[in-house]
């Protein structure tokens, strides 16, 4: 684990400072102009089968809890498939506290934590691959979006693309795969899918689904495709294949200037009346919220922000806590915003928007329905091999 002296987490700034960083978490990966790759360096794998320290391969022992997190309702360990027939390729969101414009490829506590929180649970269904990539850092975002250059954007995308190509050429061996991203990771996967997969019939056939959370995937109004992708539609059932699951989570009506769910020019999105932001969630409306019981890496920006959300503190000794009936949710297009609108059931904590209402529950996107999403991947896998 890296302990470089040059690393000074932005979480040590005053509250307004790191909240300002959060307010720009994903704004940098949207306008990704083509260009030359960053200096070549071999892929550093955050998650890969066989790694000695693999945050995507922990115990899956789980405690089912009451809505307030205090009463144990049961314990179980989901069985892992010994030889998974599919892979999951994951790009993590903006988490790096490196003190540079683009992160390096050293694995730090914040990357380990985010992989555990967002990707590890899929290991019961698939082999999980997650490359480190040179994302635009929180430190750079603190300087303001207008200071982010096309070069920084190219470095982030080309680094992620290099990880994808390494996986595809050296580890995939023709296997079906699921793509998983959140925030900056989703924006990068939008571009990668559009350029590398959408027009490639072979790869499109092997794409089980793409789970692109908190990333404002664009589609044509009144159509299943168009917008970001010409050939890959939205997922409308949990057995549909070669399609996209996408949503951003809110528990209050999204404001007119909401960062997610609207084609309003925020985060660099086009102001185009023929497009809409996709909300496609083919899971059960009774959300299975799943979280690690270990806290997010202390002393990091995202760790500090996560503490503000308000999830129940779990009374559990297992690696995971599951809240089976704390929240319900479904896609909503009320007031022109396409989002996953959730509501708390009795006893469930009211979750807070961080940094403000325009962001909704962005920091919960990957976990609020994680149990449902892993079940969808199971159903999709069954459908893929039963064709």
Model region roles, listed by residue range:
Residues 49-52, 81-84, 90-176, 337-387:
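Active-site catalytic motif of lipid deacylating hydrolases and related acyltransferases
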Residues 159-174, 194-350, 378-379, 383:
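Surface cap/lid and interfacial helix-loop subdomains adjacent to catalytic sites
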Residues 1-15:
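N-terminal secretory signal peptides that target proteins for export/translocation
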Residues 18-31:
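Bacterial N-terminal signal peptides
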Residues 33-36:
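N-terminal signal peptide c-region/cleavage motif recognized by signal peptidases
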Residues 39-84, 104:
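Catalytic-loop region of hydrolases
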Residues 181-185, 189:
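Gly/Ala-rich beta-loop-alpha elbow adjacent to hydrolase catalytic centers
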Residues 91-94, 132-136, 182-183, 212-216, ...:
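Active-site-proximal beta-strand/loop segments in catalytic clefts of secreted hydrolases
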């Amino acid at each position: 684990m890296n302990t470089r002296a040059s690393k000074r987490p932005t979480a040590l700034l005053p509250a307004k400072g790191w909240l300002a960083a959060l307010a720009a978490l994903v704004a940098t990966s949207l306008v990704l102009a083509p260009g030359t790759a960053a200096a070549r360096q071999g892929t550093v794998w955050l998650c890969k089968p066989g790694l000695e320290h693999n945050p995507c391969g922990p115990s899956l022992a789980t405690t089912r809890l009451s809505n307030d997190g205090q009463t144990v309702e049961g314990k179980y360990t989901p069985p892992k498939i010994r030889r998974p027939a599919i892979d999951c390729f994951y790009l993590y969101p903006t988490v790096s506290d490196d003190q540079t414009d683009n992160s390096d490829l050293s694995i730090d506590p914040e990357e380990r934590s985010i992989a555990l929180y967002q990707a590890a649970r899929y290991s019961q269904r698939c082999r999980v691959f997650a490359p480190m990539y040179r994302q635009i850092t929180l430190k750079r975002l603190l300087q303001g979006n207008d200071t982010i250059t096309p070069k920084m954007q190219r470095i982030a995308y080309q680094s992620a693309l290099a990880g994808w190509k390494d996986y595809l050429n050296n580890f995939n061996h023709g296997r079906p795969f699921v793509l998983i991203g959140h925030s900056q990771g989703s924006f990068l996967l939008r571009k990668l899918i559009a350029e590398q997969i959408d027009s490639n019939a072979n790869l499109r056939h092997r794409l089980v689904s793409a789970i692109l959370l908190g990333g404002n995937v664009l589609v044509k109004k009144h159509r299943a495709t168009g917008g970001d992708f010409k050939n890959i539609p939205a997922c409308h059932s949990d057995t549909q294949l070669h399609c996209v699951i996408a949503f951003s989570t809110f528990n209050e009506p999204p404001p007119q200037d909401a960062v997610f769910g609207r084609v309003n020019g925020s985060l660099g999105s086009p102001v185009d009346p023929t497009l809409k932001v996709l909300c496609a969630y083919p899971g059960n409306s009774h959300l299975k919220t799943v979280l690690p019981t270990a806290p997010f890496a202390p002393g990091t920006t995202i760790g500090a922000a996560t503490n503000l959300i308000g999830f129940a503190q779990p009374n559990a000794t297992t690696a995971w806590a599951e809240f089976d009936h704390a929240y319900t949710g479904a896609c909503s297009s009320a007031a022109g915003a396409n989002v996953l609108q959730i509501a708390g059931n009795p006893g469930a904590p009211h979750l807070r928007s961080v940094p403000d209402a325009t962001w909704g529950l962005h920091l919960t996107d990957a976990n609020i329905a994680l149990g449902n999403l892993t079940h969808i991947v199971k159903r999709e896998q069954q459908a893929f091999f039963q064709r």
